[in-house]
Amino acid sequence: MVRRVACLAVIVLAFLAVSAIADNSAKEKAAIIIAEKWLSLVDAEKYAESWKEASELFRNAVKQEQWKQSLQAVRKPLGKLLTRKIKTKTYKTSLPGAPDGEYVVIQFGTSFENKKEAIETVTPMMDKDGKWRVSG
């Protein structure tokens, strides 16, 4: 009897672990879609629109004009985007300096016209309205 209960407990724990992994995988996929759409705005130099599409946390931390000026200064010297591929993606519920919540930290290996190897880190978060938005 004890052996059956122990086996059942192991099966339940394994099921819960697989379920959590699958849930995080779905969240990572949703966050990646948002990150790529957001980066396409940045690539198209639609900086004001990228600011508007960012999370509330992001918009409260950075003024729109400041964001536009920063991106113009940083992105222009890089030239046109050549390639971008996901290197890593990690689901987190806590990040340094940010409120607890749901985040996916995504690193892209990126190549630009004037910078052959770059790492871009984009962190979508689940915003208050239940939608994924870029927070940093």
Locate each region found by the language model:
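Second-shell loop/turn segments in exported
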Residues: D23-S25, E36-S40, E53-N60, T110-S111
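Short, low-complexity N-terminal intrinsically disordered segments enriched in polar/charged residues
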Residues: A17-K46
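Exposed beta-sheet edge and beta->alpha loop/turn motif
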Residues: T88-G136
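Short solvent-exposed beta->alpha transition segments
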Residues: I32-I34, A48-G101
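Bacterial N-terminal signal peptides that target proteins for export
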Residues: M1-L8
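Bacterial N-terminal signal peptides
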Residues: L8-A17
